[in-house]
Amino acid sequence: FVENYLPLVENGFDLVSANKIANTIGYPFYKKLRETLAQYKKQYLYETNVGAGLPLIDTIKLLHHSGENITRIKGIFSGTLSFLFNTYSASDAPFSEILQKAINSGYTEPDPREDLCGNDVGRKLLILARELDLENEFEEVTIENLIPEALRQGSREEFLSRLKEFDPIYQQIKDNAPAGTVLRYVGDLHGDLSQTATARLDVKLVSVPVTSALGQVKGADSIFEIYTESYGENPIVIQGAGAGAAV
């Protein structure tokens, strides 16, 4: 449907969308859309692209357009994966059991591999990078796929019947985590963010101190830390519900 965005704007329509496609496909389209919006004095509202109902994108826009130098954005972008690893880190239950609970609770996509592959988090991170006028493409995002190689192909039904194959892999990761840490699946926009070539976009499973802001997250909450030149090592933190029917 995004191919209709330009003619819609040209014919006098504002745009409102929860869909991420227009903000994550090739940068030439992204740039052309914004030039067209400016030319026709129209708005494109997409706050829910990242962070569900949290006021994240608007906050980043306001900071950036005010001249504040944003130096890093780090956070838990997926409410689904937040629930998985928050629960897993605090429980003795096997990973497959917690994943099944997430499926039953409606936290995941119909095929949970859409959440577990990490691409959705990668797209969200890319959207934030582009808000800082970086011209990165999706292919430049480094994404850790959480799905064991043997389970990435095949039908949804076959995948759901083999969830126990996750257990030894994630038990080993959990056992190897340093004491006093918990597992979190984190998106991290860092490096020199003043230019596209030096910006780094990483999405991966990491161990964080249990006492940190990311380590304290509960349930299916999302959390975002926005580091700026003015605030130094004390980031602006935005946190709230990241998954579930209500959001």
Range-by-range predicted roles:
Residues 12-14, 79:
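Glycine-enriched alpha-helix->loop->beta-strand junction motifs that scaffold or abut catalytic
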Residues 15-18, 44-48, 72-75, 238:
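General beta-strand structural signal in soluble alpha/beta enzymes
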Residues 59-123, 128:
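Conserved anion/nucleotide-ligand pocket segment
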Residues 72-74, 82-85, 89, 192, ...:
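Catalytic, metal-anchored helix/loop core of enzyme active sites in primary metabolism
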Residues 97-216:
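Substrate-binding/catalytic subdomain of NAD(P)-dependent oxidoreductase enzymes
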